[in-house]
Swiss-Prot record:
Annotated organism of origin: Helicobacter pylori (strain J99 / ATCC 700824) (Campylobacter pylori J99)
Family of the protein in this entry: Belongs to the RNA polymerase alpha chain family.
Quaternary state and interactors: Homodimer. The RNAP catalytic core consists of 2 alpha, 1 beta, 1 beta' and 1 omega subunit. When a sigma factor is associated with the core the holoenzyme is formed, which can initiate transcription.
Catalytic activity line of the entry: RNA(n) + a ribonucleoside 5'-triphosphate = RNA(n+1) + diphosphate
Function: DNA-dependent RNA polymerase catalyzes the transcription of DNA into RNA using the four ribonucleoside triphosphates as substrates.
Enzyme type, top EC level: transferase
Pfam families per UniProt: RNA_pol_A_bac, RNA_pol_A_CTD, RNA_pol_L
Keywords: DNA-directed RNA polymerase, Nucleotidyltransferase, Transcription, Transferase
UniProt key word Acyltransferase: no
Name the record gives this protein: DNA-directed RNA polymerase subunit alpha
BP-aspect Gene Ontology terms: DNA-templated transcription
GO molecular-function terms, A-Z: DNA binding; DNA-directed RNA polymerase activity; protein dimerization activity
InterPro entries linked to this entry: DNA-dir_RNA_pol_insert, DNA-dir_RNA_pol_RpoA/D/Rpb3, DNA-dir_RpoA, RBP11-like, RNAP_asu_C, RNApol_insert_sf
């Protein structure tokens, strides 16, 4: 029998459908019609943006002064060494379990290797560090050569460009971009379910994969907890009758838009395509129309689709309509970044 409700149905079922390695499929139900996508999308965004991981943000190599130096007795130059280092996923054992509300949680580790040897991620395992992708290559050290370096590994979330970590670095350390998120992929599906013979209810199925720094189910629970805390503030505090200007909203969005395109983790082909035309920041892509992006030299369908997907994940689909004020504010911000050489 149909009824006229005065309150939405509260979901009562959460199931782990599959669990294999660093991947999990979770089912949540039942939801009122339209509620599933309303909740699934922000949870997905929070998984990507607020999941806590570990990354090296400072590097000191004996005998090296900047990232364009060569490494004596090592096949790779410093730039390639750094690129390989960024592909390695760390767990800083001393920081596991510490209160995530504490800022600037870090650990310093020192390494010394003598050639000849093929240095791989597993060689960085120690009493303080656990490597979750041990087979990743790092460097080729030639005979009679020695490689001494130190890392500063931070606990954090999201992506932090090197410009923002420069002031944290002790003398002699090169700042690195920090890609902290341990989430490799998260997608969801919405399905209809029967509740007392009524098919107009929904179920969310999340498919979550991490890089091994965190269990995927724990990552899901953590994202839900973050969402609950963010929304809970409205029930705990009176909402002031304050008018917010457009500039305030634009400043709030600007964190994503002023990030470098490296933060999007694009394929090399895709990145080079944008780099050749001087695109440095996410905001520059947001300002481009669909036709402009497709018209970029060597921009094939595969590259376009990749960029479109990444922008959509950030909440700025290709061709996002901005008000004249927003476009002007964003352009000025990007010009300011260029004038400062990328430092904001």
């Amino acid at each position: 029998m149909k009824v006229i409700k005065t309150a939405p149905l509260i979901p009562s079922e959460i199931k782990v459908l599959e669990k294999e390695g660093n991947r999990v499929k979770i089912s949540l139900a039942p939801f009122e019609f339209g509620y599933a996508v309303t909740l699934a999308h922000p949870i997905r965004r929070l998984l990507l943006l607020s999941s806590v991981g570990y990354a090296p943000v400072g590097l000191k190599i004996e005998g090296v002064h900047h990232e364009f130096d060569s490494l004596r007795g090592v096949t790779e130059d410093v730039s390639l060494f750094i690129m390989n280092l960024k592909n390695i996923r760390f767990i800083a054992k001393a920081l596991v379990g510490q209160d995530s509300s504490l800022e600037n949680q870090s650990v310093v580790v020192d390494y010394s290797f003598k050639g000849p040897m093929e240095l791989r991620a597993r060689d960085l395992n120690s009493d303080h560090i656990e490597i979750v992708n041990p087979e990743m290559p790092l460097a080729t050290i030639n005979e009679d050569a020695q490689l001494n370096f130190s890392l500063i590994i931070y606990k954090g979330m999201g992506y932090v460009p090197s410009e923002n970590t420069r002031e944290l670095m002790p003398e002699g350390y090169m700042p690195l971009d920090g890609s902290f998120t341990p989430i490799k992929n998260v997608v969801y599906e919405i399905e209809n379910v029967l509740v007392e013979g009524d098919p107009n209810y929904e179920k969310i199925i999340f498919d979550i994969e991490t890089d091994g720094q965190i269990d995927p189910y724990k990552a899901f629970l953590s994202a839900v907890k973050v969402m609950s805390k963010q929304l809970g503030v409205f029930g705990e505090r009176p909402i002031a009758n304050t008018e917010y200007s457009g500039d305030y909203a634009q400043r709030d969005d600007a964190k994503d838009l002023s990030a470098k395109i490296e933060s999007m983790n694009l394929s090399a082909r895709c990145f080079n395509c944008l780099d050749k035309i001087g695109i440095k920041y996410v905001g520059e892509l947001v300002l481009m129309s669909e036709e402009e992006l497709k018209g970029v030299k060597n921009m094939g369908k595969k590259s376009y689709d990749e960029i479109a997907e990444k922008l959509n994940d950030l909440g700025y689909p290709v061709g996002t309509e901005l008000s004249p004020e927003q476009r002007e504010s964003l352009k000025k911000r990007l010009e300011k970044l260029e004038d400062k050489g990328g430092n904001d």
